Amino acid sequence: MKYLLLALLLCLAVGTAGGFKIVKTCEKDPRGYIADLGNGKYLMHLEGSPYEMGYQHGCLKGAEVQSMTKEFVKSVLAGYDIPEDLIPGLLKLGKEVAKGNEKYVPSEFREEMRGIADGARDAGYDVDYDDVLLLNMGFDVILSIAYPIATPIVAWQDKKGVACDGFVAMDDATSDGRVLMGRSFMFNPEVFHEVALLIEQYPDRGHRFVSVSAPGFVGVTAAMSSAGIAIGMDMVPAMDTKPFVSGMGCLLTARQVVQYADELSDAVNMVKGSKRGVPWLYIVGDGKGREKGGAVLEVSADKFAVRYMDYRYPEWAESLDFPKQIEDKDDLVVVANHYIVPEMYSTISYAVKDSLWRYETLTGLILDSYGSIDVEKGKELIDYLHPPNYGYYGEDENVPVAATRTLFDLSNLELWSLYGMYTDPWAHWELTTEYQPAGLDKAWKDTEGDVAGPSWKPINYGAPIIDKEKMLDSADLQKLSEADGNYVEQCVKAYAGNPNYATIHLRFNVQSSANIMLTVADQNDGLEIYAWNYNTNDWQKVYDRIYPSGFTTLRLSLGSEFVNNRKADLVLISEAKWKFGMIYDKACVAVDAAAVT
């Protein structure tokens, strides 16, 4: 039996032509990376199983996760004038409440949190699972303690400007009929504004999605999926709260929606069926499904109502001293921080003056722009409080954004988000359509990376060792890194050990084109390499020859026809059928990114 040894060395197209550059990868799992979007804005890309995505997250942003779990959580409490000596006790109570509600959190999200903690800890930072759990459930934990006494929370909200706004507009409301959703997440800016970024996730189950977030969050505050679903949430003070019961929390509920909802009705049913202890308002948009549009979900611990775009305020409630609905269009819905549906407001809820003012102002501005809302107008509308602060609007811009302003184009899967400082530019990202590889039937199925069967042995690669054909030691790598600011290290994960076929499937993160370098070692066997051609929708043979015994370096230049959604796929087939295949265990490459287009 002949054996095939492959060292798989990846040279990524990470220049600026595609609008971003990969600047960091997770050494132990390089599918996770940080991309520089320019202007000081970054995106973190994660993919794989829940634990794998979590580990990549902690590995890449361990310092920031530590800041969020330690300093941000403390700053939230300190921001409400809680004496400093009481904060440690409240944090301890918060962790106990979170732990008591952990059973409501899906196991996959718990695994992702464990991955974050492990990745951050392996990177040398003081983060444990309970820290990450509290960060992700903290909003609901705090409110499950505070809302039952209601009045102080209302005073805090009115004083501190803890508030959010949102809208969904489509059809006649927008300039070309597209579905636009605005989401203003207004919260304590401490720490958050310094570490905020976009997080793009390719989970092994469900839809891919991108969120405007901060390191440490498994849950989402504003996110959009490849199915065209977007979601955000607003606080709403109400007495229908279960003390010390947070359920899975609003952030994780929103994460479940954005990852698994195919259309608006799925989102509604997921929120309705979730375990809740605290009232919230969820705004959901759908730009791709059969139920294209938007809705506001008004929920409390035990009650639930949906305000779709065609909702009309009932006549019987007109005489009541309840907040009234202003928008009366079938292609528009707006939300602030109070219930509109009378049956929900009657649960002893509170509409603070600031929320009423924001709802009236934003709705009025949207109606004034009705029919002409495009991307630029949508950004202007959701950032109408530029900048917000208690007691004034629109004066000093040299302040942190508290915390994000985001516009989603749900028809075209694009987002624009303002975070950091008000003087910063908006970050932009396009979430491409669902990636569905295909081809080479049996060979593909036997080598499909992340769904490998029990006969497969996963191989995790180590340190970079090869640049072109030169063997490099650590000193060489250090020199290369210092000499060239475009230097990157990138690895690839694959699977070996298939007893039926000497085949390996590789999926590369690339831009519009890529140079792939493979170092192979074998005993006079033939090797065929196929790449998926998106122009012909078929596999195209890009290499076929018998190579001599020993190490041979192959270079493949893949044009744009082999790249889709920043992915390129290769299948390698050897003449040798192996029983115990092996892959060379150090399969990374040090490359000059500027030389790759």
From Swiss-Prot:
Membrane topology term: Multi-pass membrane protein
Origin superkingdom: Archaea
A GO cellular component entry from the record: plasma membrane
Location(s), subcellular: Cell membrane
Signal peptide, first to last residue: none
Pfam families, A to Z: AAT
Iron-sulfur listed as a keyword: no
Record bears the keyword Transmembrane helix: yes
Transmembrane segments: 4-23, 209-231
Keywords linked to the UniProt accession: Cell membrane, Membrane, Transmembrane, Transmembrane helix
Protein name per UniProt: Uncharacterized protein AF_0267
Species of the source: Archaeoglobus fulgidus (strain ATCC 49558 / DSM 4304 / JCM 9628 / NBRC 100126 / VC-16)
